[in-house]
Amino acid sequence: MSAVDGGSKRGVSRRVFLGGAAWAAGCAVLWAANRMLGRIPAVRAQPEELTPQAYFPLAMKRYPQPKVVRVHAAAATSWDFQTGWYGEYVDQAVVKQMLERGLLELTGGGSMQGAWAMLLPGYSSGRKIAVKVNLNNCRSCDDSDNVIDALIEPVNALISSMVQAGVEAEDIWVYDASRRIPARFYERRENQQASYIDRFGCADQTATFNHVHPSLKVSFSHPQMVTDRWLTDLLYDASYVINMPILKRHGTNPVTLGFKNHFGSLDSLGGAGDDNPHPYINPQDDRYSVDFSPLVEINANRNIAQKTVLTVGDALFGASSVGATPAPWTSFDGSPNSLLLSRDPVAIDCVMCDLLRAEWGLDDAAYDYLMLAEQRGLGTFETGDPWGGGYNRLDYRYVEL
């Protein structure tokens, strides 16, 4: 199958995203310029000096053209969208092949050892790797509904590839610091040495917020957001961060992808009235502004920005809204059956936005936080057509298994 086919049978009924690649490549530049017109670059705080305990592998990162890889395998899932829990219909062996193939394509390495040597520069035994999963819809340790949440299979595949490359499993922390890790996720883990950490004690450990270092404090530039939030302590103790969002839309922010996944790294999202971050990510709220995004300010924290070595987007099923049950996609003729990988957190969110927009449509405001993120130096922004050649700044690659 060619890259243009994009992992599905594109019939007459298929939507042609934004009028095709040529339109996307030309008009996206004009559209983005109009959205950004009149913006004032955010004021950046002076970086703090940290102790040697906090190792920043990306402090001197210099990447060539940002690369985003999408790996598709029709055999990855087999759910009929009716019977039982969708998580029972995922082929672990296929997902491992997808993840490993994606890592090789992303890094150009000839083996898992070579790929992870690039992704984990300076790794040695004892340096921790924090893996952020999205279990936002899990409300109990024995959660059993069919609402979209993280699946264990991509996590198992990720850990397996790292261990294969020589990483100590004990150095891997899988976490959601604001939610529960349910039994149906935790009990299906393949590696017993990696640690699983949540907010409510459903797994191995409970995430702590002891403010172990001032660099974990997240202060917002908006004058109405006066309450400081704190990142979980493990992000200071970790040397590397891997982000594993789910491909889905949202009801408040138009999308919930990699940047929003780190809401689950904070001690609290609460706050009365204007001190709550949610109005500022909702384009329908009067308090929303294209010049401010709490998502960007959270992800700009150096414990995230300077430690994130990889984002793996779980698009095995995806969802049309934050609390939806997976449903067939028109643009994939069923489940997306895909994993996306990138070293650039902005670029991969752009491509995932484009996939969501092609299927369900998105307001232009869905991309605002990504334009701000590029201004903050967090990555590369571009909209385009993931079904064809609609990217100029991004090196978008499609792999079919």
Regions from the PLM with identified roles:
Residues 60-125, 136-145, 149-157, 164-401:
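Extended, low-polarity segments enriched in aliphatic/aromatic residues
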Residues 31-73:
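C-terminal segment of N-terminal export signals and the immediately downstream linker at the start
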Residues 27-30, 349:
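Alpha-helix initiation and N-capping motif
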Residues 1-12, 23-27, 35-42:
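N-terminal secretory signal peptides
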Residues 19:
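Phosphate-coordinating loops and pocket residues in cytosolic domains that bind phosphorylated ligands
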